Amino acid sequence: MFRLLRFSPSRYYPRSMAPVRWSTHPYHVTAPRMWGTRMPLQLQASLRPNNAVEKGISGDVKVAGAMVKPAASGGESAKSKTPTVSELKILKDLFRYIWPRGDRKVKTRVLIALGLLLGSKLLNVQVPFFFKSTVDSMNIEWGDVGTALPIAVTLTVLSYGAARFGAVLFVELRNAVFSNVAQSAITKVSLQTFQHLMKLDLGWHLSRQTGGLTRAMDRGCKGISYVLSAMVFHIIPITFEISMVCGILTYQFGASFAAITFSTMLLYSIFTFRTTAWRTRFRRDANKADNKAASVALDSLINFEAVKYFNNEKYLADKYHTSLMKYRDSQIKVSQSLAFLNTGQNLIFTTALTAMMYMACNGVMQGSLTVGDLVLINQLVFQLSVPLNFLGSVYRDLKQSLIDMESLFKLQKNQVTIKNSPNAQNLPIHKPLDIRFENVTFGYDPERRILNNVSFTIPAGMKTAIVGPSGSGKSTILKLVFRFYEPEQGRILVGGTDIRDLDLLSLRKAIGVVPQDTPLFNDTIWENVKFGNISSSDDEILRAIEKAQLTKLLQNLPKGASTVVGERGLMISGGEKQRLAIARVLLKDAPLMFFDEATSALDTHTEQALLHTIQQNFSSNSKTSVYVAHRLRTIADADKIIVLEQGSVREEGTHSSLLASQGSLYRGLWDIQENLTLPERPEQSTGSQHA
């Protein structure tokens, strides 16, 4: 059986793309999109740790010349399990933000906006009446004009202008008043979504493509803005204005005009809604292709160095081009269907307007209507063209925004699996803490166990090392203690208490971690150190920098601690990054310390200097330290060594006792590392030798 692995260059090479433009999501690039629009590319630093298997650009894997389709990725399976959110539920959830309980300020703004909306529509309907009066006043024999008529005409014209300006003024005031409500709603939803994503477990994040995730958040936030404005300023006003015009036509000119108007509105709405529903699938396909293109670009750009190392620029360009072509095809269908919708809408409205104008002209000829009435009917019906055009575009964009918001609200509906128990207690951090694994079984995949019925104890206040071959479960122990995952069986105790009964925040606050690849923010050295404890004073940060022996580095840098480390810390060396990580955990001052392959990527000289720094700062009995290591020389002085093999504890003891044990796995690993020799070169054949 072949073991299928999906290669991810980001596991081996740093991501080197600097941020281009900050938005609600970091690393936001805008690239040309087909047909004159723009396609934003979300470049988000991946949430996956470097030792996690990531999904590559292509989901297919070649094994022995055959193309093998891997099982559904975590993202796909997770997607199928994600709860669906109905449009009605989305609108109901959104209503809570524009009419929040107990917030009178927001409610007052909404009521004022609705009042201004009503006033603008009433003034807007008055405009055709003032125009009719002006036309009728002018339709006289000018030789009989007295002095009073010009004044009446002047007042009518002034009223016409005042009504038009008043309607526009009320609309702008309404927008200004409601903008605060809309932006506050967007801010609240964005923040709540971000906070919810931070609460979701690590397994959920590993199963998602970050580029598509940030794109969904970006579109969803924009969708909120549009839905709020559409519902408050378009749907309600259009309905109100159509009802008012139909009532006026019925009262002024009879049921025949109102019947045509009502039939037109009904046919127009049915055609718009059905055509838009048909177009929705094209929009969904476009969004899917858009996410795919963004993910391909994201994976390619953040692994820029790997692309160059293997000369695969053309391969990735072809991948990106394929995604863009799918997006282009979807957008063409969107544009073509939009042209069909606009043509149908205009045909329906123009036919109705022509019929009503013909009827009005007959009325003028028969003497039942005046020329002013003809103008009034034309103005009233034609005035509906604006809200009707809005109805079509608003419904189209409203459906699209609801689709975009669906993805955003789906994120909020994902359940948090790692959470506090009802009676969670705080973990005491004023004393050394021990860690006990009792019959723990765990696997990232149900078909592949990483730990199998493991039991061991990490003594309090002592240095314990965990060693073993690759894949034996060493780093998994940290993830379980940190409660990134829950064990399938057994339990883990810290300080004598099951970690499931401990407050999650207090547990994680008690654990300090120095990882193999230190995650750094694209910020200054000072801010990166401060991240270990953001409430620390300047003096405490300086002491942590001194203890981690970063002072010399800062002295050699032109800007000192204000130097920006670059994306993922590329502006400083590996040893300096690890010292920065040590400064962080010194600032955190946690009673439990994990060093997860903290020196494996360093040269011998840097490794020894870093081990000396660790020894100076973490050798006291006040802290429990756990070292996960491949290089056995770095943990030879440990008080206890736990050797793992194939997910089980093979042996335990000190360095000397394990070396003294004949046939021990630890001794075999030690001998291999200490007696490593170069393989002999094969002898050349006699025929190839030269005298």
From Swiss-Prot:
Which key words are in the record?
Answer: ATP-binding, Membrane, Mitochondrion, Mitochondrion inner membrane, Nucleotide-binding, Transit peptide, Translocase, Transmembrane, Transmembrane helix, Transport
- Which compartment or compartments is the protein found in? Mitochondrion inner membrane
Q: Which GO terms describe its biological process?
A: intracellular iron ion homeostasis; iron-sulfur cluster assembly; iron-sulfur cluster export from the mitochondrion; transmembrane transport
Question: Does the record bear Magnesium in its keywords?
Answer: no
Span of domain ABC transporter = 435-671
Q: Where does ATP bind?
A: 444, 468-479
Identify the enzyme class: translocase
Transmembrane intervals? 110-131, 155-178, 228-251, 253-273, 340-358, 374-395
Q: How does it assemble?
A: Homodimer.
What is the official name of this protein in its record? Iron-sulfur clusters transporter ATM1, mitochondrial
Q: Which organism is it from?
A: Eremothecium gossypii (strain ATCC 10895 / CBS 109.51 / FGSC 9923 / NRRL Y-1056) (Yeast)
Q: Which gene encodes it?
A: ATM1
